[in-house]
Amino acid sequence: MKRSKYFGTDGIRGRVGLSPITPDFILKLGWAAGKVLSNYGSGRSKQVIIGKDTRISGYMLESALEAGLAASGLSAALTGPMPTPAIAYLTRTFRAEAGIVISASHNPFYDNGIKFFSIKGTKLDTQVEYFIETELNKCLKCIQPKLLGKAKRIIDAAGRYIEFCKGTFPAHLSLKKLRIVVDCANGATYHIAPNVLRELGADVIAISCNPNGININNKCGSTDIRRLRTQVLLKKADLGIAYDGDGDRVIMVDHIGNKVDGDQMLYILAKEYLYQRKLHGGIVGTWMSNMGLALALRELNIPFVRANVGDRSVLLMLREKGWYIGGENSGHIVLLDKTTTGDGIIVALQILSTMVSNSVSLYELCNNVYLLPQILINVYCSGFINPLESSVVKKEIQIIKQELSDQGRILLRQSGTEPYIRVMVEGKHYSKISYLANRIVSVIKGEMRSVN
């Protein structure tokens, strides 16, 4: 199958006002998706769940999607601002034909995107995405007036999802003795995560929970934990929890301000599942996963494999192997025994239940996993030229790999969601890998200048 024109690793994403994130394109996308999804759902409900994060552009894109779906004969059930995993859950429980999320995840407010979920609450198969793109190449033709779709609001969508999240936390446990700072990135979890934690008994200090349409992910959330760390120390909290704009990622901070990333959380979950005799097989990470995670899991005799970067790749490998737990160091973690996609709130609850049931701190849970220093630099790269194909860049990479030998790793890749080249260097000594990473960046930038 040829490469997708519009769909990336996580749906369709881009700058609002520029193709493809324009109201006219999104309207036609709704129509094309409606025509295809009606054939891949149950065919009975004729309903699609639509959720969004808190970006100001969400109103415009929601209306466009709604119109396009109606023109195809499908009705829209609107949730308002809701975490991405909540839409996956609601799609299943409402037996909808599909779920659609309007979000650009951890990106700034001026970006937005569209993600699709199947009737089972899973990411759409790439073949279905291809069929949608095929329909997009056709002229929009409205269905007969009497068959047009409608639109309605789902009553208490947030309450339904809150109860689902709480249901994944052991009924005999409570968070009453914990003080937790929660940073919702001014995003879709702002009215969900604090309430989940409070209803389970925690003393909650909520920050970045006042979205205004343009402050989503702005110096807050899982991509910038400086304010969270400050508040944890200032309020003498037991830990801090940070979500990204659409709630499918989570990063934590222990009581002394140490960052706890996705790799450390994977280790905590793997060890607890092993102890509870619930671990099926092993753990799926990605090529970005720290070598320290692999070594720590080896000590526990837990198998560890690496998938390509992206939750879709992690999910595919989990299903292929029949395993439950996988994720990325960015905090995007999947627990297939709990839900069908990455869910930051549910992952955090499993970490909290491990703390409470074992009467240990988050700091103590991380004691036996030692992450190697890792440098990640994003190099802006617009246009169609891929500097990673340059012979000059390839030669420099080979030289640096020889310098690192078996004492570290290098990973270079193009982002599937943003116009960046990701440069990752990992090794035992921070000063050395920082020097090597910046050498690579200099060569990449030099090649882009020479091409331009």
Curated annotation (Swiss-Prot):
It catalyses: alpha-D-glucosamine 1-phosphate = D-glucosamine 6-phosphate. InterPro entries: A-D-PHexomutase_a/b/a-I (IPR005844), A-D-PHexomutase_a/b/a-I/II/III (IPR016055), A-D-PHexomutase_a/b/a-II (IPR005845), A-D-PHexomutase_a/b/a-III (IPR005846), A-D-PHexomutase_C (IPR005843), A-D-PHexomutase_C_sf (IPR036900), A-D-PHexomutase_CS (IPR016066), Alpha-D-phosphohexomutase_SF (IPR005841). GO terms for cellular component: cytosol. CDD domains: GlmM. Activated by phosphorylation. Mg(2+) binds at residues 105, 244, 246, 248. Binds 1 Mg(2+) ion per subunit. Keywords: Isomerase, Magnesium, Metal-binding, Phosphoprotein. It comes from the Bacteria. Its EC number is 5.4.2.10. It holds the Pfam family PGM_PMM_II. The active site is at 105 (phosphoserine intermediate). The modification Phosphoserine is found at residue 105. Its cofactor is Mg(2+). One of its GO terms (molecular function) is phosphoglucosamine mutase activity. It is an enzyme of class 5 (isomerase). One of its GO terms (biological process) is carbohydrate metabolic process. HAMAP family: GlmM_B (MF_01554_B). Belongs to the phosphohexose mutase family. PANTHER family: PHOSPHOGLUCOMUTASE (ALPHA-D-GLUCOSE-1,6-BISPHOSPHATE-DEPENDENT), PHOSPHOHEXOSE MUTASE. Catalyzes the conversion of glucosamine-6-phosphate to glucosamine-1-phosphate. This is Phosphoglucosamine mutase. It comes from Blochmanniella floridana.
